[in-house]
Amino acid sequence: MAIEQFPFVSVSGAPYERGRQYGTALRDRVKASAQLYGKTLDELGYDSVRKSALIKAFATQIGTFGEHYLEEMRGIADGAGIPFDDVVMINARTEVIAQARREAENADPEDDPDDGCTGAVILAERSATGAVIHGQNWDWRAECAETAIVLRVRRDDGPDFLTFVEAGGLARCGLNGAGVAITANYLESDRDYRQPGVPLSLIRRKVLEQQHFAMAMRAVATTPKVASNNMMLSTAEGLAIDFECAPDEAFPIYPADGLIVHANHWQSPIALSKLKETGIPSVPESYYRDWRVRKLLDQAGPKLSTDDLKAAFFDTFGSPYSVCRPPRPGSAGNLSATVSMVIMQPSKGIMEVAPLPALNRVFTRYSLNEDPVTLAAF
């Protein structure tokens, strides 16, 4: 049976109106996304009063970061016909679920590890076309293949942007009309969940709103976070920098041999001298996933194409603990998989996305300027 491609919506107008268009167009997926994460709080024993109090605390943090984000979420909620709290939950699910688990006496912290992911950037000097190529495999719950979407936002106050995101979310990975692109990977350290901070998805959204690469870097490097995360930034001007972020500090990693490759373990020697790596029990295969991608890219030659990056991301070494992860039981009994493969060309404003790539090799090309096109199988 053919796997459904991710639906696309293009929105414009003021924040609330953009959100309303989004929620209306993708009502069923937004509801499914809300149910997926709301169910987790139910399983942790949260009644409606406790759930609302927990989510409102994060809404306050988001509003301080940017009130327009809350306006857009209100529009999504109204368009989809779901409570506002549910949309906040989608956008702060990492932080909300982690806080709920810490408050639940009987919760196993390994029940719901965060996103996996393997990301890479091919710089201009290694690119066959002379243009940056930026991509990622997103590893998470297999059912998110049925809740994720591609969103295009037409803005009057900054660059348009394109993002692959869970329905109801404001951003995950993506690129904008100024040539800035971002992907992000799960990291964990002993500094996590000790301070208030901005939900990670909102920081990624902030990046996509920036006209200048320097301001995108500032959003990543200086915004306080609740938890660690790796954020990989690139620009159509030819540069990429990876930031391994602790909640209160960021550690840059620069390209080597025209490449940046990152999985889910800390690499910065400075970071490792200052904090403790705590995420490996959830993602032990991270230690070879980035090595495999780099090796395959180097073997492909001195000049690389989008097809070379796709081929590296389709790697099955160590399956099912591979770069391209087939659906397999996760630690909580749910199915875990590479939900999507995303390949971006920031200079062209295009993003090619394949759902469940271990089972499917059909990509759809999404664009800042054109309608989506389904491509021939890779």
Model-derived segments and spans:
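C-terminus-biased signal that marks the final domain/tail of proteins
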Residues: M1-G116, E209-P252, A256-F378
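Internal mixed beta-strand/loop scaffold within catalytic domains of large alpha/beta enzymes
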Residues: R93-L202, R218, V339-I343, M351-V353, ...
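Short, well-ordered beta-strand elements within core beta-sheets of diverse protein domains
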Residues: I203-L208
